[in-house]
Amino acid sequence: MTTQYGFFIDSSRCTGCKTCELACKDYKDLTPEVSFRRIYEYAGGDWQEDNGVWHQNVFAYYLSISCNHCEDPACTKVCPSGAMHKREDGFVVVDEDVCIGCRYCHMACPYGAPQYNETKGHMTKCDGCYDRVAEGKKPICVESCPLRALDFGPIDELRKKHGDLAAVAPLPRAHFTKPNIVIKPNANSRPTGDTTGYLANPKEV
């Protein structure tokens, strides 16, 4: 492998506007039921009593997540046709001419990245906009973010600059697939496995 690319996700800046998601859908000409990049809204809170006075303790934050082009992708391990594979540049892609649409990859991926396209009759997924990257550009989701909450580049450089945090609630623990992402947590971020909050928009992700 030459260079492993990855995404930087700044949850402290993300407002959940979904511009990245819509830009991706437009650029990739996706059908309504398919979204390669999705916005997770994690929320929670309760009431706390202080000397007879009750106060709210509510929180919410957003995470913009697509395929994480994992170091150890679960999707490629279960693909019976070999359609799902990891390229030399680290991008995990699906060969749509080879895919048989069994959906095993979707069931295996803890991030739900591979998605079935009803119109095409097979799986589709984020390919990291490798065509744009080859031209020296960044993925369309990164360039469209109005708050600059996303970045992209060689994962080693991103980790050197931003650290190596790759999981907060509601994401799974990073050791399962070793995702090539770096997260700057929101001030309200909870650790993976947290039970004080919940995924507020399950139908959207």
UniProtKB/Swiss-Prot annotation:
Q: Does the keyword section mention Mitochondrion? A: no
The residues listed in the UniProt record as binding [4Fe-4S] cluster 4, with positions renumbered to this chain, are C79, C99, C102, C105
Any one annotated GO CC term: dimethyl sulfoxide reductase complex
Task: Mark out the compositionally biased spans (Polar residues).
Answer: 186-195
Q: Where is this region: Disordered?
A: 184-205
**Which Pfam families does the record match to this protein?**
Fer4_11, Fer4_2
Q: Which GO terms describe its biological process?
A: anaerobic electron transport chain; anaerobic respiration; dimethyl sulfoxide metabolic process
| Residue ranges occupied by any 4Fe-4S ferredoxin-type domain in the UniProt entry | 5-33, 59-89, 90-119
What GO annotations for molecular function exist for this entry? 4 iron, 4 sulfur cluster binding; dimethyl sulfoxide reductase activity; metal ion binding
Family matches, as CDD domains: DMSOR_beta_like
Purpose of the protein: Electron transfer subunit of the terminal reductase during anaerobic growth on various sulfoxide and N-oxide compounds.
**Residues reported to bind [4Fe-4S] cluster 3:** C67, C70, C75, C109
**What's the source species for this entry?**
Escherichia coli (strain K12)
Q: Which residues bind [4Fe-4S] cluster 2?
A: C24, C126, C129, C141
Cofactor note (record): Binds 4 [4Fe-4S] clusters.
Family matches, as InterPro entries: 4Fe4S_Fe-S-bd, 4Fe4S_Fe_S_CS, DMSO_DmsB, ET_IronSulfur_Cluster-Binding
Q: Which residues bind [4Fe-4S] cluster 1?
A: C14, C17, C20, C145
This chain's protein is named: Anaerobic dimethyl sulfoxide reductase chain B
* Keywords associated with the record: 4Fe-4S, Electron transport, Iron, Iron-sulfur, Metal-binding, Repeat, Transport
